[in-house]
């Protein structure tokens, strides 16, 4: 009778010689188009283990093992922008001459109105709620070009009789624990918050 350890070793050696790779990742296949051994496994088509996809590095084409070969041109996976670059460079070369001709033929403003030239430029950063700050033509902003005329002195949000005072001087309920003082009716001229906010908006 044969030693079981020796029998096991010989059987394992035979299996390794006869056994082909179990997964497609381990296979080194030749390209079916150019017969190059310079190939690699990429992925399984639709996650199906029976359809491994391979890539040939020499002819730069993909194929599925056991599948039909498509008529794909060599290097079809790469993008070449050389034609786009040449057309864009030729159009950019002709554009400076066109722009210089446009500058020569451009007419000055047909209606040179001094009132229009004195209007301030409407910078989009100076827009607040859709109204340009400092534009005197907007109704409701005739006084100094600010929104301070639109604010009521003691406007209050109704929160059960109390609420937040919008004049910026404090909270209506001093027990809020924030250390802010109670609004006093005679202290409206001494309110730094609304003037500070309006001055900040006007300086921009």
UniProtKB/Swiss-Prot annotation:
InterPro entries: Dof, Znf_Dof. Zn(2+) binds at residues 31, 34, 56, 59. The keyword Metal-binding applies. GO terms for molecular function: DNA-binding transcription factor activity; transcription cis-regulatory region binding; zinc ion binding. GO terms for cellular component: nucleus. GO terms for biological process: regulation of DNA-templated transcription. A zinc finger (Dof-type) spans 29-83. The keyword Transcription applies. Transcription factor that binds specifically to a 5'-AA[AG]G-3' consensus core sequence. This is Dof zinc finger protein DOF3.1. The gene is DOF3.1.
């Amino acid at each position: 009778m044969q030693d079981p350890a020796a029998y096991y070793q010989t059987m394992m050696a035979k299996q390794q010689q006869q056994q082909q790779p179990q997964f497609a990742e381990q296979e080194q296949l030749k390209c079916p188009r150019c017969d190059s051994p310079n190939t690699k496994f990429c992925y399984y088509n639709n996650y199906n283990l029976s359809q491994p996809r391979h890539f040939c590095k020499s002819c730069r084409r993909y194929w599925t093992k056991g599948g039909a070969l498509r008529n794909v041109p060599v290097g079809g996976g790469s993008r070449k922008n050389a034609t786009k670059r040449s057309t864009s460079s030729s159009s950019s070369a002709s554009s400076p001459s066109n722009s210089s001709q446009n500058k020569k033929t451009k007419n000055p403003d047909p209606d040179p109105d001094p009132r229009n030239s004195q209007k301030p430029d409407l910078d989009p950063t100076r827009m607040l709620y859709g109204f340009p700050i400092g534009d005197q033509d907007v109704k409701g902003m005739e006084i100094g070009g600010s929104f301070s005329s639109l604010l009521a002195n003691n406007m209050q949000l109704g929160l059960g009789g109390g609420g937040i005072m919008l004049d910026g001087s404090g909270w209506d309920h001093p027990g809020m624990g924030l250390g802010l003082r109670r609004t006093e009716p005679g202290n409206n001229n001494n309110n730094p918050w609304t003037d500070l906010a309006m001055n900040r908006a006007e300086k921009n």
